[in-house]
Amino acid sequence: GLGDVYKRQIQDGVLAVGDRVDSEMEIQEMYDVSRITARQAILELEQEGMVKRGRGKGTFVTYRPKIKEELSHIRSFTDEMTALGRTPGTKSFHITKEIPDEATRELFGLDEEMMYCVRRVRTADDVLLVYFVSYFPLSLNIPLNMEEQTQSIYEVIGAPTRIDEEFSAINPSEEICLALKIRKDQPVLARKRISYDKKKKKIEYTMCYYRGDLYSYTISTSQKL
C-alpha cells in the first residue's frame, strides 16, 4: 500500500528525521487516490512510530534507523560507532569507589571490598543510545579524575583479550529511564559483559542498556566443512 511506499523512503533515508511528509491532499493528487486512502497511509506510519503529526504544522519523520552491530570481535563503543559511520559522544561520565552488590562481589571473589564504579551515558550522532554501569577492581588504578579526560577506559586499563557476553530484553528501571530519557514501557536491550586480561583474570563487569528502538545486534556463525 501507500504506507509501505513512504515507509521504504524513510527506512532508506530518502526521508530523514525532521523531513516533512506529503500531506493527505498532496498524496491524493500524486497517486490519484481517495482522501481516506491518503489518510490511512499517514495513519499507518504514525502507528509504527515513523512520523508525528503536528496540528496545523504538517507531518514530520521521527524514525531513526537502528544501529546494527555485528558481534564478531572485541572493540569499544567508540570503535563500534566510528566503524558504522556514526559520531560517538558522551553525555555523562561519573566514576566513584563503592562496595558493589553481592552478586558482583562474588563474581570477583571479594568480601566487603570497594571497587571502581563507572556510570556513562553514550550517544551516537548526539542521540542518547546506551547507559553503561561498569565495575573494575581497585588494582587497576583508574584515576578518579578520568571523567575530565577524553581517553577511553580501555586505554587506561588495557584492552581485554576475552569477553563473555549475555543478551536479554528487559523493561527499564527508573534509573535507566532517567539516564536515557525513555518511558517505562520502552524495551531495552541489556548486554552483560565480563572481560578478562591475558592472564584470564576478570578485569571488568559491565551492564549495558541500549535503547531497543535504536539498536540491534547481529550474530554470524559459520561451520567448517
Walk through the language-model features, giving the residues of each.
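Short, small-residue-biased leader/transition segments that mark boundaries at the very start
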Residues: 1-6
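Beta-hairpin "wing" of winged helix-turn-helix
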Residues: 14-19, 47-56, 62
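A short alpha-helical element within helix-turn-helix/winged-helix DNA-binding domains
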Residues: 20-31
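Residues in the helix-turn-helix
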Residues: 37
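Short, hydrophobic-biased segments on the C-terminal half of alpha helices
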Residues: 42-43
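Short, cationic-aromatic polyanion-contact patches
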Residues: 60-73
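C-terminal all-alpha effector/ligand-binding and dimerization domain
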Residues: 75, 87-225
